[in-house]
Amino acid sequence: MLRLSDIYSAASAVRGKYSGGTIMSYTVTPIGYVRSCFKEKFAIPRQPLLAPAAQGCIELLPPYDQADAIAGLEDISHIWVIFLFHKTLEDTPRLKVRPPRLGGNKSIGVFASRATHRPNGIGQSAVRLERAEPGRLWISGIDLLDGTPVLDIKPYVPYADSLSMAHNAIADSAPTLITVSWQPNALQQAEQHAQRLQQPLIELIEQCLAQDPRPAYQQPTPERMYGVQFYDVQVRWRYLTLEQIEVIEVCLA
């Protein structure tokens, strides 16, 4: 039987070991990489499942590209993807961050946010598993940059992972969406590229831009143009007001 005194003694020993400068370190090896509709960080939804039309796949590396590694996934609708924020790795630790949800000006502790600047650069996202085949997992509702290294995959377990009693005063509900409108020629361009790509491009653009991707501290004017690449197309838009975006152009990147 494990006694509390044993736990306290062990904790003291660990503190003593760390205070002496001996800290455990380890390396991780990706099990695969994400192939995503998002080619740059800007305009990626700040949480998973906010843009159901955002699709991609996880390309698994050997030995995890074999059928044995995915056996049973056919009975699972959603998975947790554990990944590396490979574009925001830093040598200097950040103790406080400025989350967009608080306007980009207020700081909170790094452990109270899901900011990409993490102590070990590790992130996790719950995404929908569309289908699985040896070497590839097709997923949607993603918030993952193309080329993201995947460290692990775990099944989403509804009774354990959905906590009805949980609360978060900082982000207790999904952000308010803003209106997305189209110039006629831009909508026609998007329809043509959607047909060529065989992807829900119009829905992707609307769902991502409705999240208001601009930095929270910016006060855009109608003259200022924004742009981002989805798949192989460049999308350009402007803010008619702080609550309305107008898509101007959708063209090959």
Describe these PLM feature segments.
Residues 132-158, 250-253:
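Short solvent-exposed strand/turn elements
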Residues 240-253:
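Enriched for short, Lys/Arg-rich terminal
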Residues 4, 8, 23-67, 73-75, ...:
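Arg/Lys-rich, positively charged N-terminal/basic patches that mediate binding to nucleic acids
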Residues 202-228:
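A conserved acidic, glycine/proline-rich C-terminal tail/linker
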Residues 1-20:
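N-terminal amphipathic/basic-hydrophobic helices that include classical n-h-c signal peptides
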Residues 35, 127-130:
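Conserved positions in beta-strands of structured domains
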Residues 69-123, 211, 217-221:
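Active-site-adjacent substructure of cysteine-protease-like catalytic cores
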Residues 25-30, 117-126, 231:
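Short coil-to-beta-strand transition motifs
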